[in-house]
C-alpha cells in the first residue's frame, strides 16, 4: 500500500529542510499535548472523587430536609406550611468566578448565605412550629451543597470535553500528521538521491561525449599532420 505523503510537494532540499522543521514542531507539540491530556485526566479523576462526596452530601442533606418538612407538615398541616413558605424572603447571594485548569476555564462558586433566624426568613413566629424552623434550616444547608454540586459537575463536563478534544489532536498528530511528514521526508530524500544518480549518469555521458570528440579531433589532427608529411 502506498504511503501517505503531502500532496503537491516539491522534492527540493529547501522543501526537505522546511519539512524537517515542521516534523520537529509536530513531535514537540505531540509531546506537550500528551502531557496536557495526562494532567487533565488526573484533574478529572481528582474532581470526580469530589463529585461523589458532594453528591452524597447533597442527597443526605435533602433527605434530612424532606424528613424535617414532613414532620412540619404533620405538626402544622400542609396548608399552613405552604402559607409560611410563600412569605419566605429570598437571601441567596452566589458569587461565580472562574479558574484555569490546563487552559480550561472552570467555575468557582462562593455562596454567601448566613444562618437565618425566623424573622430573617419572613414567616410568622406565632403561626409556625420548631419543626418548620428545622426544615427551613435543613433546606438552606441543602442549597449550599446543590450549588457546590453544580460547580463540580460543570467542571467535570468541561474537563471531559477538553480531554476528548486533546485526545483527538494527539491521535491526529500521532497517526496522521507525523507519519505523513516522515513519509514525505523519505519520499523527498529518495527523489533527491534519484536525481543525483540521474545527474551523475548524465554528467558521465556528457564527459564521455566530450572525451570522444576530443579524441576524434586529436586523431584527425594526427592524420592531417601525417598527410602533410607524406606530401
Swiss-Prot record:
Against Gene3D superfamilies, the record matches this protein to: 1.10.287.3240
The record, for InterPro entries, names: V_ATPase_D
Molecular function (Gene Ontology), one example: proton-transporting ATPase activity, rotational mechanism
Q: Which GO terms describe its cellular component?
A: plasma membrane
What keywords sit in the KW lines? ATP synthesis, Cell membrane, Hydrogen ion transport, Ion transport, Membrane, Transport
The similarity comment for this entry is: Belongs to the V-ATPase D subunit family.
What is the annotated role of this protein in its UniProt record?
A: Component of the A-type ATP synthase that produces ATP from ADP in the presence of a proton gradient across the membrane.
Protein name as catalogued: A-type ATP synthase subunit D
Source organism: Methanobrevibacter smithii (strain ATCC 35061 / DSM 861 / OCM 144 / PS)
Gene of this entry: atpD
